[in-house]
Amino acid sequence: MYFKGHSYVRSHIGAVSSSTGKPTAFRPDINGAVRSLALSPDKKILYVGGSFTRVNSVTRMNIAAFRTSTGRLTRFAPKVAGTVVAIAATSYRVYLGGTISQVNGRRRTEAAEVTTTGKLTAWAPVLDGWVRALLISPDKTRIFLGGGFHHVNGATYEGLGSVNPVTGTNEPFRNGLIPTYHDGRVSQATSLATNGTWIFAGAEGTGTRAFDGTLAFRPDSGRLVWRNTCLGATQTILYLRGVLYKGSHAHDCSSAGGFGPIRPHWQPHHLLAENPINGELLSWGTSARSVPQPIPDTNGGVRSELGPFAFATDGLHLFAGGDFTTVNTRRQEGLARFK
């Protein structure tokens, strides 16, 4: 990490001041990639998932936990075989998603649940593809899963499903929110968010004009509320103060009443704001209908060319992290804060 002329060595994870951006003393030594972060409801524990085997010279198999007050590694140490890509935590349970095949020596298929002490529970939904996103419903009666699967517990659910938080069995949910194609195209939910009433999903499609946009649905039934069909995959979404924010490489929102195809010089919009009521594009941070070019924006970066990969909030600000090197054409690498 680099801050105001000084370099700070960190191993796959670090922390910075939310007000200044200066790196803190939190510097665990993790020997592999970090793919997911989640706080316990009381914000005392930070769960870290990814593809690693050691933390601070102690064995931790793809999942670890730290005390936020001290930065110290806890005794939470379930042994997960497979990369942990998504985490959702309650006060007593931790739900895991990713490319999971076993936990504590017992078979699991892409998703699992452990207690806060690391003990494996009986919760074991069966999926035929990896899990990229997990969200606990506002009333805590459902777990929503998004990812590259076509079936949940043997029933057809394309890229998005809903299961019971205790039994892992399917809850009533409408298939088809993520479109099903029969021509080689495929779409999957990459990110989930909620405003306390509806659930929002962002999607990534593979193939020409496959669904890349966002949608909203009712948590009790899965009934579609709205769908925004902007083209250009959505990496992350976050709801904050009446606005649904989206990190993507959107390059054509004409079908959603926004900007048309960007040609001849393909330069997507990496940051967008949407109305959570109907999915229409907004001006950044407001509830008014947007002009075609929302601001701010990032570039795509030098590795993936996709820009933002993750959003977070302290309730007031939006933090964006990803593979970008500029914000509004000014140098800002990998992490930015917006008021």
Question: Residue ranges of each PLM-predicted region?
Answer:
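Extracytoplasmic surface signature
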Residues: 1-339
